Amino acid sequence: MTGVRVTYVDAEPNGLAAMVGGLIEANLERHPDRRGLLRPAVVDLVAIDADVATSLQLDRSEVRVANGIANGRAHLRLTADSIALVELAATPLRLGFPDVFHPEGRAVTRKVLGREIRIEGLLRHPLTMSRLSRLLSVV
């Protein structure tokens, strides 16, 4: 592997935690250079339609994935329906943000501006959001 461990805090990760943890693990395996994106941060992901949440604690050598939210400790909190969260990972990026020159990027940008995808902490932590997007990106 890449020297970065993806660990699950809970014995039985919820579906969102398993999906996101697996995605990060696969991306780090396929693209070892993405290890450089890891900086200390806490990120909550909330799928409102499935009533499920996960928190990621990022570190240079480990990504800890937990069920639920980080109780106010998160630098970023992304809240959307589960389809929009998946679309976020599948959107072409430019500088770590959805590329508005691609139709998929414009669609995700519209959802962010229309608050279908809510990103709390984006203005305070834009680089964290950019690194997270590139870490999760499957494109």
Where are the language model's segments positioned?
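Feature captures hydrophobic
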Residues: 1-139
